[in-house]
Each structure stands twice: as structure tokens, then as C-alpha cells.
């Protein structure tokens, strides 16, 4: 499972990097605080305790990412920046010439995220 995660995530991130470059968006180069804390917590665990925590993180993470990607596809809010002016990368793409590129990446990536979630749930069920 872990090897599949590395392979699939590396491929998706490389492809997203190409899309971001075409959109002239510079992606973050460092891990965010939430994921940094997860890595730190997991690095202190071993054996079955690590396995349980890792699988739980994979379930929660893939549920969240799947929901975000699904929201992108079925966005019901008007396109453009949010009213508070906080323009995230996804909002910069909305309504612009690059929206289709990002939407295509999302549509190619969502099935993989769903496959990872199914795998993590199966592992969680079998512990």
C-alpha cells in the first residue's frame, strides 16, 4: 500500500507541478504545518501502533482530498475570487483560461484518490 501511495502521489504531484507552471503559480516547496506534525508523530511510532496511525491518517486525508476534488468538479459557487479577497491557487484558475487544465487534472486524479481511500478503508477494517 505504501509503495503504491508513493508512486501514485509522485506522479500526481509531478503532473500538478506542470499544470501549476503553465498557470504561472509557484507551488509550496515545504510541507505544511498539519502534514509536518503528522510526519513527526508517525516517526515516533513503531509496529502495529504505526500501522494503525498511518492507516487512520490515510483514510482521513483521502476523505478530505476526495471531498475537495469533488467540490472543484461540482462547484456551485460563482467562479472567481472569494468575497474576502483571499485568492488561493484554485481560485486564481477559476474562470480563467487555465480552469480547464486544472479541472482535467482533478478529473484524472479523483479516481486514484478514491482507490487509495478504498484501500486504506480495507486495511483499517482488517486490523
Question: What are the functions of these language-model segments?
Answer:
Residues 1-127:
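His/Met- and acidic-residue-enriched segments that coordinate or traffic transition-metal cofactors
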Amino acid at each position: 500500500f505504501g509503495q503504491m501511495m508513493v508512486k501514485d502521489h509522485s506522479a500526481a504531484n509531478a503532473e500538478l507541478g506542470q499544470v501549476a507552471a503553465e498557470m504561472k503559480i509557484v507551488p509550496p516547496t515545504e510541507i505544511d504545518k498539519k502534514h509536518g506534525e503528522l510526519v513527526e508523530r508517525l516517526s515516533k511510532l513503531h509496529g502495529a501502533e504505526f500501522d494503525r496511525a498511518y492507516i487512520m491518517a490515510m483514510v482521513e486525508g483521502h476523505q478530505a482530498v476526495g471531498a475537495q476534488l469533488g467540490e472543484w468538479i461540482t462547484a456551485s459557487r460563482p467562479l472567481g475570487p472569494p468575497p474576502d479577497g483571499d485568492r488561493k491557487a484554485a481560485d486564481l484558475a477559476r474562470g480563467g483560461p487555465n480552469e480547464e487544465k486544472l479541472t482535467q487534472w482533478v478529473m484524472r486524479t479523483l479516481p486514484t484518490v478514491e482507490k487509495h481511500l478504498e484501500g486504506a478503508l480495507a486495511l483499517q477494517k482488517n486490523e
